[in-house]
Amino acid sequence: MIRIGHGFDVHAFGEKRPLIIGGVTIPYHTGFIAHSDGDVALHALTDALLGAAALGDIGKLFPDTDQQYKNIDSRKLLIEAYRQVQTKGYQISNIDITIIAQAPKMRPHIDNMRQLIANDLNCDIDQINIKATTTEKLGFTGRGEGIACEAVALLSKKTV
């Protein structure tokens, strides 16, 4: 059996903190306003994985009202979510992530993002695709007010 999940996340810029996307710290003059580290790529991916396994969403599993998740590294959330997906007997077939940002440029960081995600999910880097696009200066991402991200995860039942 195969299952597909879709995730979406968005965060506004506005805090003097590191900008972390896909687990990678990206040099930029500002970071995200967020309860956790604000990693839009990992949040969207976590939602996609949870959705594919019918386990709800990131807010259900890691509510932003819980102080234990304040400023947490989103890689920890991703790893825990995937552990729960695995308990239902699923494994990753492939992941596709689209980062929507006018700036900063993502291309120099995508290979590092892919490798970190592959390591965290114990899968091959060829199962992880990440791409970036702009909105041609339209909307909040185009005005440089924040970044959005979509992720799709395809899961398959583990074979013994």
Swiss-Prot record:
Superkingdom: Bacteria
Chain coiled-coil ranges: none
Note on how the cofactor is bound: Binds 1 divalent metal cation per subunit.
Keyword entries, A-Z: Isoprene biosynthesis, Lyase, Metal-binding
GO biological process terms, semicolon-separated: isopentenyl diphosphate biosynthetic process, methylerythritol 4-phosphate pathway; terpenoid biosynthetic process
Pathway: Isoprenoid biosynthesis; isopentenyl diphosphate biosynthesis via DXP pathway; isopentenyl diphosphate from 1-deoxy-D-xylulose 5-phosphate: step 4/6
Chain sites annotated for binding 4-CDP-2-C-methyl-D-erythritol 2-phosphate: 9-11, 35-36, 57-59, 62-66, 133-136, 140, 143
GO terms assigned for molecular function: 2-C-methyl-D-erythritol 2,4-cyclodiphosphate synthase activity; metal ion binding
Cleavable signal peptide: none
Cofactor(s) listed in the protein's UniProt record: a divalent metal cation
Residues noted as binding a divalent metal cation in the record, renumbered to the chain: D9, H11, H43
InterPro entries in the record: MECDP_synthase, MECDP_synthase_CS, MECDP_synthase_sf
Sites marked Transition state stabilizer: H35, T134
Catalytic reaction annotation: 4-CDP-2-C-methyl-D-erythritol 2-phosphate = 2-C-methyl-D-erythritol 2,4-cyclic diphosphate + CMP
Documented EC number(s): 4.6.1.12
Subunit structure: Homotrimer.
Family indicated by similarity: Belongs to the IspF family.
Function description: Involved in the biosynthesis of isopentenyl diphosphate (IPP) and dimethylallyl diphosphate (DMAPP), two major building blocks of isoprenoid compounds. Catalyzes the conversion of 4-diphosphocytidyl-2-C-methyl-D-erythritol 2-phosphate (CDP-ME2P) to 2-C-methyl-D-erythritol 2,4-cyclodiphosphate (ME-CPP) with a corresponding release of cytidine 5-monophosphate (CMP).
HAMAP family the record matches: IspF
NCBIfam families: ispF (TIGR00151)
Name of the protein: 2-C-methyl-D-erythritol 2,4-cyclodiphosphate synthase
Organism the protein comes from: Haemophilus ducreyi (strain 35000HP / ATCC 700724)
Upper classification of the organism: Bacteria, Pseudomonadati, Pseudomonadota, Gammaproteobacteria, Pasteurellales
